[in-house]
Amino acid sequence: MAKAVGSAGILVKESALLLHPELLSRDFLLLSLERRNIPVEDALNNKEKLTEIFVQHAMPLPQRDLPRNRWGRMMESKRGENKIATVLKSAGTEGGRKRPPIVFDGCSTSTTIKVKRTENGDASQRLNPSPKESTNSTQNSNPAPRLGSPTPNKEAKVATTGNHGQLDSLPVTDSALVSPKSAKLQQSMIINAVKLKRNAPKEEFDVANDTKPTEAKKKIQHVTWP
């Protein structure tokens, strides 16, 4: 191994000089820092600052020395294989890339908006329907019942209450065959039947409410203390 003389006049190895920058001269420190492109404008004449910069940026990191036995040789071979594998892998990934990497440079930020078509038609047709479709939709949403003009060849049974609460059915035929007086009578009968049907549950509910308190009173047992 080659040996060199430091600033203190001590014979040391070249590798040890890098680990002990205080033994190096100012010119050597400046040269080594300039080769590593480290700016040293503020510490040109100050060796202490140069040594601090060298320790911070240029001093090699400590590495473990493997023993000279079978295990050490095996680990050295593994380290070499790992380094070769990483180099080959990086070269293969760069060469086998299907497409170049995407770089966002600010110029490719303009995008266009695409409207997806539906099965029934374009989105514009769905947003702006034709007048026929709009009229059909309004008719379907707001159907107007017509009492005076029922459909022909169809009979509707009208419920009427009797003495025992039984319902009789009366057929209602076309409006052309029915006189206006009979039509008014039928309408009044329909209204009365609807009122009776609506009032019946209320009466039953009142009867049920009248029976419930008596049953609750019967269940209450008064406790007497001795």
From Swiss-Prot:
GO terms of biological process kind: anterior/posterior pattern specification; convergent extension involved in gastrulation; embryonic morphogenesis; regulation of apoptotic process; Spemann organizer formation at the dorsal lip of the blastopore
Entries under InterPro entries matching the protein: Ashwin
Keywords tagged on the record: Developmental protein, Nucleus
Gene Ontology CC terms: nucleus; tRNA-splicing ligase complex
Keyword Ribosomal protein belongs to the record: no
Region entry Disordered, spans: 89-171, 205-226
A Pfam family assignment: Ashwin
Tissue: Expressed in the neural plate and later in the embryonic brain, eyes, and spinal cord.
Origin superkingdom: Eukaryota
Listed transmembrane segments: none
Locations listed in the record: Nucleus
Polar residues bias spans: 121-143
Family: Belongs to the ashwin family.
Free-text function comment from the UniProt entry: May regulate cell survival and anterior-posterior patterning.
PANTHER family xrefs: ASHWIN (PTHR28359:SF1)
Identification of the protein by name: Ashwin
GN (gene name): c2orf49
